[in-house]
């Protein structure tokens, strides 16, 4: 005979019983307890999986809105007119395009972001390509422009040894003037051709006036006097050359007064020939005889 031996755990469990053949069998009264245990374990498993299902639902992206060509044309036209439409405008656009106001608001938000990004890229390209080459061609390095200056020893140097004295300036070199010299830039001309021409023409003009030779000679002497020459030269000289007095136009006014007085004297010294009456060959008696009574 074969005997089936039970283990210690099977012998201790109340749910097991020996059949006639000696094989262990489950007690039918304990099936409800086993079913409840399985249900509880299944519920616990579902409860643990519920948070994961919620997180998966949250991670799911919403369905993208597909716009038609007519809707995009209407939205683009409105965006060109107004980039920040208010609530009423968005509602009107939603009615025209058969969309919701929320979809229209989101579209305008994304369109503004795209527009700002494109503007920034265009400005960066202009600064990099357009203006960069022009500024590099126009601007010179500081070393080339200020090679003669020594900024480190600026405070220790005196005015005599200033770098300006050694620096060459095209404007001053063309005029043969040092930039730090104290001499005046403009000097009065030593000889003026126009005044010499005028003085040479005056005697011929005076000689053409009828009068005595002595008066003409006197007038010529007056014209050649040093007062006239000095007045004429001072009148024609540049006003910047008068450095003697503080007033610039004093000599010009005095010369004009002197010239007027000289002209008046010349006019008074001119001698006009006296007009002589025609000599008559008739005597007073003849006048009396010829008159009718």
UniProtKB/Swiss-Prot annotation:
It holds the Pfam family Homeodomain. In the adult, high levels detected in the eye and much lower levels in internal organs such as liver, gastrointestinal system, heart, genitourinary system and pancreas. It is found in: Nucleus. Residues 1-69 are annotated as: Disordered. A motif (Nuclear localization signal) lies at residues 260-264. GO terms for molecular function: DNA-binding transcription factor activity, RNA polymerase II-specific; RNA polymerase II cis-regulatory region sequence-specific DNA binding. Its main location: nucleus. A motif (OAR) lies at residues 255-268. Gene3D superfamilies: Homeodomain-like. CDD domains: homeodomain. Residues 37-48 have a biased composition (Basic and acidic residues). Transmembrane segments: none annotated. Transcriptional regulator which may play a role in the differentiation and maintenance of meso-diencephalic dopaminergic (mdDA) neurons. Required for lens and retinal development and for pituitary pre-placode formation and cell specification. PANTHER family: PITUITARY HOMEOBOX 3, PITUITARY HOMEOBOX HOMOLOG PTX1. This is Pituitary homeobox 3. The gene is pitx3.
């Amino acid at each position: 005979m074969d005997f089936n031996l039970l283990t210690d755990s099977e012998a201790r469990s109340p749910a097991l019983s020996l059949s006639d053949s000696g094989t262990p069998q489950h007690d039918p009264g304990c099936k409800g307890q086993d079913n409840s245990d399985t249900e509880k374990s299944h519920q616990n498993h579902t409860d643990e999986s519920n948070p994961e299902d919620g997180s998966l639902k949250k991670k799911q992206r919403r369905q993208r809105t597909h716009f038609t060509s007519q809707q995009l044309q209407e939205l683009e036209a409105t965006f060109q007119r107004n980039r920040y439409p208010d609530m009423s405008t968005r509602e009107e656009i939603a009615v025209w395009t058969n969309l919701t106001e929320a979809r229209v608001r989101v579209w305008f938000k994304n369109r503004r972001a795209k527009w700002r990004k494109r503007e920034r890229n265009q400005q960066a390209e202009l600064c990099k390509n357009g203006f960069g080459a022009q500024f590099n061609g126009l601007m010179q390095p500081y070393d080339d422009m200020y090679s003669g200056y020594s900024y480190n020893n600026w405070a220790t140097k005196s005015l005599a040894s200033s770098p300006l004295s050694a620096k060459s300036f095209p404007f001053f070199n063309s005029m043969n003037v040092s930039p730090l010299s104290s001499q005046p830039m403009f000097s009065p001309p030593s000889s003026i051709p126009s005044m010499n021409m005028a003085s040479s023409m005056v005697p011929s003009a005076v000689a053409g006036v009828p009068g005595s030779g002595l008066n003409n000679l006197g007038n010529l002497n007056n014209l050649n006097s040093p007062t006239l020459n000095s007045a004429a030269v001072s009148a024609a000289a540049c006003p910047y050359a008068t450095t003697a007095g503080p007033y610039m136009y004093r000599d010009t006014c005095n010369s004009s007064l002197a010239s007027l007085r000289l002209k008046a004297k010349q006019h008074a010294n001119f001698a006009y020939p006296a007009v002589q009456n025609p000599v008559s060959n008739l005597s007073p008696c003849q006048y009396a005889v010829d008159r009718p009574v």
